[in-house]
A protein has these predicted regions:
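Catalytic centers of hydrolytic enzymes
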Residues: 1-203
């Protein structure tokens, strides 16, 4: 891989400095909001395959047969040693992502009609209103671009680690019609839909 290859992967947009490439930003989400982000990924991927979330340090499993915004059945935080721990709904987790992706996460509330809620915050839990204030900078004051972060990571390895030759299992599709799986970990919207279906069948 060359620097130009890495640039082509993440070459869109520009930051506050006007130079090519979206910069990385640092924001904080609650565990509940992370789970909602996974739901967005699982529900939207089938409709827009190009619009996917890939998260380092997290894993989630979804069932495509479940209802919209209720497709994720399991999720966890993956620690550096490879072990998985449950995600705490109330804890704040640091998320580093591109400026564009961060801005799009903030639109989920409206796009999901309030079913899902993702509100990026600062480390103290205050709602972010200007994402450019949370851009990550190099020691020399320049923005850390998405493409540059990727190029630097590839360069640090010398030869690309063989584990990248195949998916790491961070996003797992588990298609099943098993009733227990279809009802597992439903959110409020899911249970209301189930209740409505039961009432219709009982009428």
């Amino acid at each position: 891989s060359t620097t130009s290859d890495a640039f082509n992967v993440s070459s869109l947009g520009s930051g506050a400095d006007g130079t090519p490439g979206y910069p990385l930003i640092s924001v904080w989400l609650t565990g509940k909001e992370l789970k909602d982000a996974f739901e967005v990924d699982a529900s939207v991927t089938a409709l827009m395959p190009e619009a996917q979330i890939y998260g380092a340090g997290m894993t989630w499993t979804w069932n495509p047969h479940r209802m919209m915004f209720n497709k994720v059945t399991d999720c966890a935080q993956v620690l550096p040693d490879g072990s998985a721990v449950p995600i705490d709904d109330d804890r704040l987790y640091r998320v580093v992502t591109g400026l564009y992706t961060g801005q799009m996460l903030g639109t989920v509330n409206d796009q999901s009609f309030g079913i899902l809620a993702i509100t990026p915050k600062d480390a103290q839990g205050n709602v972010i209103t200007d994402y450019e204030e949370h851009i990550i900078y190099n020691p020399n004051g320049s923005e850390v671009k998405e493409w540059y972060a990727l190029a630097s990571y590839l360069q640090s390895m010398g030869e690309v680690d063989g584990r990248y030759a195949a998916p790491e299992g961070r996003k797992v599709e588990h298609a099943t019609w098993n009733p227990l799986n279809l009802l597992k970990n439903l959110n409020l919207f899911g249970w209301l839909a189930v209740l409505a279906a039961v009432l219709v069948l009982a009428a």
